[in-house]
Regions:
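Aromatic-rich peripheral "rim/lid" segments of glycoside hydrolase catalytic domains that contact
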Residues: 2-44, 52-61, 85, 98-100
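Active-site mouth loops of central-metabolism enzymes
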Residues: 40-52, 115-123
Length: 138
């Protein structure tokens, strides 16, 4: 079980570095095996809000030969101060990858329950967030 560092969007922490890099930055044994399957095999890599490891993560992805990347932008994070600046930085760092972008995590204030997995009170608000992100980064 993973303890959450933050109430919203905390699953980012469980996905960091694809399970291929230790928290201290050292490669795990699986890293060399994974590299045998790139670029055909893509990877899911999440970066949490203002993740200080973004640049290192992108460098590892490039070093591994990753071309196809699934990542996400958090609706919950969009309610934070400087969210667009973070999203811009993240998407700029990932621009050389074939990105499949997902939208996730309900802000506590917008959910039927105060939880990042809660359905939104107003689905149209989530749709507006998705549309804004697609217009900004497509």
């Amino acid at each position: 079980t993973t303890r959450h560092r933050e109430a919203e969007g905390s699953s980012y922490y469980r996905h960091y570095y694809m399970g291929l890099i230790r928290a201290d930055g050292q490669p795990k044994r699986a890293l060399s095996k994974f590299a045998q399957y790139t670029p055909e095999l893509g990877i899911c890599q999440w970066f949490h809000f203002e993740d200080p490891r973004l640049d290192d993560g992108v460098a590892w992805l490039k070093r591994l030969g990753v071309k196809h990347l699934r990542t996400g932008l958090s609706w919950a994070d969009s309610h934070r101060e400087h969210a667009d600046a973070w999203f811009d930085r993240q998407m700029k760092a990932l621009e050389n990858f074939d990105v499949t972008l997902t939208f996730c995590f309900t802000p506590e204030s917008c959910g039927k329950r105060p939880h990042h997995t809660s359905p939104p009170h107003c689905p149209e608000q989530f749709a507006e967030f998705c549309a804004r992100m697609v217009q900004r980064y497509a």
